[in-house]
Regions:
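Mobile, glycine- and charge-enriched loop segments
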Residues: 219-254
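Ferredoxin-type iron-sulfur electron-transfer modules and their immediate structural context
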Residues: 1-136, 140, 209-222, 285, ...
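Large, well-folded core regions of big proteins
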Residues: 163, 191-213, 223
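Terminal amphipathic helices with adjacent charged low-complexity linkers/tails
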Residues: 37, 146-193, 286-291, 308-314
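Cofactor-cradling patches in redox/metallo enzymes
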Residues: 256, 260-318
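Long, compositionally biased charged/polar accessory segments in the mid-to-C-terminal portions
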Residues: 241-245, 267-271, 276, 470-475, ...
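Conserved acidic residues
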Residues: 61-65, 211, 245, 270, ...
Length: 514
């Protein structure tokens, strides 16, 4: 009944209560209260006590929140900055309070991402296509937004913790990580590869390639420090990093993806190792595992061996799995170069970087890709489409739904064309097609085939039986006549009128009325 925000802590209610039902915390024990309401009378000028008041949900914006509930209001692996939920332990509560007291002043928070709505494949025509970034975000910072049938995603920068997983799983590159960007990381990787390979030129191991070990800045660095100390103290039991393994620290391990990995291989690294140090959200581990499987599938399709590997530890002190992998690498020795080191720079555009890296690796691939391509996992951003020509009426709904311009129509004749290089396998065309005539086909084909504009379906135009003007496709009109031709409303002359263009139908109806 006592509103803590209105209460002035004067203590008048405590003094006048005959049952001593109000304690020093200014809470009323309703089991003791006999409803004399002397406290209400005493507090009339303030109005802080009201037995008729019901619980109301309140909203507000705060920089710092101390949640003392046993079950916190926010239950996600990465809590927002400024939110503390220490639980019921008094010691943890005091530690959280101490941290809060020190958080005074103004702080700058980087904007980790940039978003290009134009190439986002989230939604068109009221249909949802890709929602990979929404599904993977552990802080729930990304939400879906539709306006006039057009879908996009919105990111709350205050909830974003900079993991970068959204950019890793984004097939189109609409979501881009900027802390740092792939272009900046590409310069780092290129410099590391060139320096290492340059030092090996004068040795017999000139064709050996270094291994790139990517790890998170905080937990990953701590894990490698533990590994290094253990290897110095117990060299027989613990294996440190071999000389050909080059570590690279990033803000968060989930921020790296297929574009940086393939770019690293193109620059001269023999393999890419991803160190998971135990502080990642389970969803991030799953996403990285899927991306690793996809990248290895692409490499195997080109005739290479699997060159991307996850090293999974459960904490920064869990050095055993890392030591085991390092021991295996030391015995195996360094990989050979996959291809001549590339000279191109990684782009800010994910698809451009991906295509450039693929083209370089395909140039030196041990085997050529078959014309029909090699199947890839279902979550692949690369692939084509299969169109059921018997079901397709060439209504071109798919063309209007495609956000990447992979599907094209022909203004001169009923024809559906496709450029596989542009397709991100978002599924919007499949969702939009009224005849369910489109099926996604994740696969890897040669660069020449992927750049080629191919015709998926075409038919003859239907001409108005009155004026001869083309106003639809032959298949569409035949399908329409087959579906509604038996209805009594379209018998006789009315059925023939369906074979006319819109102008001639009006003229024909006016003639019949006159």
């Amino acid at each position: 009944p006592i509103d803590p925000e209105m209460c002035t802590r004067c203590g008048a209610c405590v003094s006048v209560c005959p049952e001593n039902a109000i304690d020093a915390s200014f809470q009323i024990d309703l089991d003791k209260c006999k409803s004399h309401r002397a406290c209400v009378t005493e507090c009339a000028s303030i109005g802080a006590i009201n037995f008729e008041r019901t619980d109301q949900a309140r909203e507000g914006e705060f920089d710092l929140i101390l949640d003392l509930q046993e079950i916190p209001s926010i239950q996600i692996s990465q809590k927002p900055q400024g939110y503390f939920a220490p639980g019921p332990d008094p010691f943890e509560q005091s530690m959280a309070a101490s941290q809060l007291m020190g958080m005074v002043g103004e702080f700058e928070k980087p904007k980790y991402f940039s978003y290009n709505e134009k190439i986002c494949a989230h939604g068109r025509n009221g249909q949802v296509g890709c929602s990979a970034c929404i599904d993977v975000c552990s802080t729930k910072a990304i939400t879906s937004s539709f306006k006039n049938g057009q879908g996009k995603v919105e990111v709350n920068p205050n909830l974003c913790m900079g993991c970068g997983a959204c950019a890793t799983v984004c097939p189109s590159g609409a979501m881009r990580y900027n802390y740092p960007s792939v272009a900046y990381q590409g310069k780092q990787v290129k410099t590391l590869a060139q320096t290492y390979l340059g030092a090996l030129k004068s040795t017999k191991a000139g064709d050996a390639a270094p291994s790139l070990l990517i790890h998170s800045q905080k937990a990953g660095t701590a894990l490698l420090d533990h590994l290094g100390r253990a290897a110095r103290l117990h060299p027989k039991e613990t294996s440190g990093l071999p000389a050909f393994v080059i570590p690279l620290a990033v803000e968060h391990i989930a921020s790296t993806g297929i574009d940086l990995w393939l770019g690293s291989l193109a620059y001269g690294f023999g393999e890419v190792l991803l160190l998971l140090s135990g502080d990642e959200d389970p969803g991030y581990r799953l996403a990285l595992t899927e991306q690793v499987d996809l990248t290895n599938s692409i490499l195997v399709a080109m005739g290479y061996s699997k060159r991307i590997q996850c090293i999974t530890a459960n904490a920064s002190e869990d050095i055993a799995p890392v030591s085991k992998v390092m021991s295996e690498l030391r015995q195996r020795k360094a990989h050979k170069l996959l291809a001549n080191p590339a000279s191109f720079a990684l782009s800010l555009q994910k698809r451009e970087t991906l295509e450039t890296s693929l083209e370089h690796l395909l140039q030196f691939a041990p085997q050529a890709l078959p014309a029909e391509g090699v199947p890839l996992p279902a979550h692949s951003p690369l692939g084509g489409l299969i169109v059921n020509k018997d079901a397709c009426t060439l209504c071109m709904s798919c063309v209007g739904a495609c956000p990447e311009g992979a599907l094209l129509d022909n203004p001169d004749e009923p024809q559906l064309s496709f450029i596989e290089k542009q397709c991100v396998q978002c599924g919007l065309c499949e969702q939009t097609c009224p005849e369910s005539a489109i099926t996604l086909s994740p696969r890897l084909r040669s660069i020449e085939h992927r750049k080629e504009k191919v015709t998926l379906n075409k038919t003859e135009p239907f001409h108005c039986i009155s004026c001869g003007k083309a106003f639809g496709t032959l298949k569409m009109v035949e399908l329409m006549l087959g579906r509604i031709g038996s209805h009594q409303a379209f018998s006789g002359e009315a059925l023939e009128r369906l074979k006319m263009c819109s102008d001639c139908r009006v003229v024909d109806m006016m003639k019949k009325e006159l």
